[in-house]
Regions:
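Hydrophobic alpha-helical transmembrane segments of multipass integral membrane proteins
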Residues: 65, 69-81, 85, 185, ...
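Interhelical loop and adjacent transmembrane-helix boundary motif
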Residues: 2-8, 38, 51-60, 208-261, ...
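Membrane-interfacial helix termini and adjacent extracytoplasmic/periplasmic loops
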Residues: 39-44, 48, 114-149, 181, ...
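Cytoplasmic-entry segments and transmembrane alpha-helices of multi-pass inner-membrane transporters
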Residues: 8-16, 20, 85-120, 170
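Transmembrane-helix boundary motif in ABC transporter permease subunits
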Residues: 1-7, 73-105, 125, 257-264
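Membrane-embedded alpha-helices of multi-pass transport/permease systems
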Residues: 24-27, 31, 80-84, 118, ...
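Transmembrane alpha-helices
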Residues: 14, 19-26, 155-159, 165-166, ...
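C-terminal transmembrane helix and the adjacent membrane-cytosol boundary/short C-terminal tail
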Residues: 2-13, 94-97, 159-174, 180, ...
C-alpha cells in the first residue's frame, strides 16, 4: 500500500519508460503528418498538403460523418439501457433469472467480437428473409451491434457506482413519502451522474474504435472510419492517415480536458454544498430538509 513517501528512482524510471513507449509514437505520427514527402518515413520538409488533401477526400469525410453519428447514437442508447440494467442488478437483488440476466449483460464484454458480429449478421439476414427488415445493412445494423456491446460496459460502471452509494438517502426519502420514480431522478441519478458520463464517453470511444463488428454489419455505402483506415493501411502507409490521426488525437485531447474540467467542477460544487450543509445548524423537526440537502 502506498504510504505517501516519494517514489523510488527505479520506479520513476520505469514509469518514464512506460510513458515514453506510449507517447513517442503518437508524437512522431503528429510530426510526420506535416511531412511534404509521400514517403511517411522520409522527411521531405514541412507542409500542410496532407491536411488539405484530407479535407478534400470525400471517402474519409463521409466515413468520419457516419462514425460520429453512429457513436453518438450508440452512446445515448447504451447509457439509457445500461443505466437501467445496472440499476436492476444493483438494487433488485436476487430474483428469478437474475443470474441469467447478469450473465447476458456481461457476455458481450468477454465474447470475441468475431462471434458477436457473425451472430448478429446471421440474425439480420434471417430477419430480412422472414420480415423484410432491415432492408439493407448500414447505419441501423451497426448501431444495434455497437449498442449491444457498449450497454454492457455502461451497466457494469453504473452498477459499481450504485453498490458504493449509501442506501440511507433513498430509504430516508421513502420514509418521507417520496415515490420510487422521484427518488430515482432526484437522488439516485445525480449520485451516479459521473458514472453515467464515464459510460457515455466510453461508449463513444468503443464505437469509434470498432472495426470487427462494423465489418460484419455494414453494407455498401456505410463504411466507417476504422474500416477506411484499415483498408488504406493494408495497401501501404498513407500520409493522409497521419494527418487524420493527428486531428483525432487533438480532438480527443480537447474533449477529454473539457469532460474532466466539467466533472471536477461538479465535484467541487457538491463538496462545497456538503460542507455548507454541515456548517449550517440543523433545525428541530427539519428531517425532510436534511434529506433534501444531502441529496
Amino acid at each position: 500500500m502506498y504510504n505517501g513517501n516519494p517514489l523510488p528512482k527505479s520506479l520513476k524510471g520505469v514509469l518514464l519508460l512506460g510513458f515514453l513507449f506510449l507517447y513517442i509514437p503518437i508524437v512522431s505520427l503528429i510530426i510526420y503528418s506535416f511531412n511534404a514527402s509521400k514517403l511517411v518515413t522520409v522527411w521531405g520538409g514541412f507542409s500542410t498538403r496532407w491536411y488539405v488533401s484530407l479535407v478534400q477526400n470525400e471517402q474519409i469525410i463521409s466515413a468520419v460523418t457516419l462514425s460520429i453519428k453512429i457513436a453518438l447514437s450508440t452512446a445515448v442508447a447504451a447509457v439509457v439501457l445500461g443505466t437501467i440494467a445496472g440499476f436492476v442488478l444493483a438494487r433488485f437483488g436476487r430474483f428469478r433469472g437474475s443470474t441469467l440476466f447478469a450473465g447476458m449483460m456481461t457476455a458481450p464484454m468477454v465474447m470475441p467480437e468475431v462471434i458477436t458480429g457473425l451472430s448478429m449478421l446471421l440474425l439480420f439476414i434471417s430477419m430480412q428473409q422472414f420480415f423484410g427488415q432491415p432492408s439493407e445493412r448500414g447505419f441501423f445494423t451497426i448501431w444495434v451491434g455497437h449498442t449491444t456491446l457498449c450497454m454492457a460496459y455502461v451497466a457494469v460502471v453504473v452498477r459499481s457506482r450504485l453498490i458504493e452509494i449509501d442506501k440511507s438517502l433513498e430509504e430516508a426519502a421513502m420514509d418521507l413519502g417520496a415515490r420510487p420514480l422521484k427518488i430515482f431522478f432526484l437522488i439516485t441519478l445525480p449520485l451516479v451522474s459521473q458514472a453515467i458520463a464515464s459510460g457515455f464517453l466510453l461508449s463513444i470511444t468503443l464505437s469509434l474504435d470498432d472495426l470487427v463488428t462494423a465489418s460484419f454489419l455494414s453494407g455498401p455505402g456505410s463504411t466507417t472510419l476504422p474500416m477506411v483506415i484499415f483498408s488504406k493501411v493494408r495497401l501501404g502507409l498513407n500520409p493522409e492517415i497521419n494527418a487524420l490521426a493527428a486531428i483525432t488525437v487533438l480532438l480527443v485531447g480537447i474533449f477529454v480536458l473539457i469532460a474532466n474540467y466539467l466533472m471536477l467542477s461538479a465535484q467541487r460544487t457538491r463538496m462545497k454544498a456538503v460542507a455548507a450543509a454541515m456548517r449550517e445548524p440543523a433545525k428541530p423537526g427539519d428531517a425532510g430538509g436534511a434529506v433534501a440537502t444531502a441529496s
